[in-house]
Amino acid sequence: FIVETLMAVYRHNGLLKGSIISATNAHRLGANEAPPAIISSFLGKQLTDLLKSLEESYDDALFNLKGKKALKLDIPQIPELLLDNTDRNRTSPFAFTGNRFEFRAVGSSANCAAAMIVLNAAVAESLADFKERVDRLIAEGMDKMKAIVKVVREDIKTCQPIHFEGNGYSEEWKEEAARRGLDVATSAPKMFQQYLAPESIEMFRKTCVLNEAEL
């Protein structure tokens, strides 16, 4: 679920920014301890290491083939792991803290409905896409757990550009984000245009949330 949430944020980082933007919020973002105007996600060291291990490990290191197949990630229980390693990077607009993601770019007095509509639709699209790809591999004869791990690995690699652990206020990050292909627009009208991007229209259509005329 974490990986597919990251995929949603990666695919639609520009639209997520469009969902929270206003003239006043555009002025606020990137200053006065507000998150920067580039959407990225902070995970913290242990989750980052876990995803890296999952991406790079050989199948034999991940699976116990004696009896029932099961993942062997060699980590403590997830709730304890995360609660003990809550690292609050305040410069991240979309951070994992403790046991949840926080989308911090919404203005403090703003209605969060638009942001929630976009975020929920984007995650729903990612989860549906994940299931379709896993089902396709299973239909081709692959073991269910191996199919899941294969798709998760692919998505960990694909969404790497959205993952950033550093200082979101730095000029270096703005340049790096542009190189990664992330949306770096700072103009509110340009951010609003993300609602009419082909990938946004398709996402809302597939999830039956909004049609093109409504957008």
Where does each model-flagged region fall?
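Hydrophobic, small-residue-rich alpha-helical packing segments that form membrane-like cores
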Residues: 1-2, 8
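Acidic, glycine-enriched catalytic cores built around paired aspartates
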Residues: 9-215
